[in-house]
Amino acid sequence: MDFRIGQGYDVHQLVPGRPLIIGGVTIPYERGLLGHSDADVLLHAITDALFGAAALGDIGRHFSDTDAAFKGADSRVLLRECAARVKAAGFTIQNVDSTVIAQAPKLAPHIDGMRANIAADLGLPLERVNVKAKTNEKLGYLGRGEGIEAQAAALLVKAGA
């Protein structure tokens, strides 16, 4: 079997005046993530993990932050397009595991919705998608609440392998 593992990472600054969208879920909070698209840090990390596992580059290669077409883009749409490109390259997505690091707000009440969105967008059963939430124990820029970070891992298998 031809297995491929990909790792993804993203971080965005928290700023006033933007919605906070993580895993396709809008979370009530006084600040949101700054970015060219909707700045969904979790979906961006997963997208990078999938592209990386398939050796297709990264999110910026496919959805450039200098391209006006992606200004304000819904990251769920980008994730679905990523999945289509990975499948077109001959891979089947096996599972995704991810971690969101945020001092605030509390993400636990929103994890089920995030998992459901990701599973739906990737065409996976819910039990193949995991999202964990951690704080940074008040250390560094994440601990000071200046941003939110996400990390993801994805496993692909070459179709027919």
UniProtKB/Swiss-Prot annotation:
Its EC number is 4.6.1.12. GO terms for biological process: isopentenyl diphosphate biosynthetic process, methylerythritol 4-phosphate pathway; terpenoid biosynthetic process. It holds the Pfam family YgbB. The record marks H36, T135 as: Transition state stabilizer. The keyword Nucleus does not apply. Homotrimer. Belongs to the IspF family. This is 2-C-methyl-D-erythritol 2,4-cyclodiphosphate synthase. It comes from Burkholderia ambifaria (strain MC40-6).
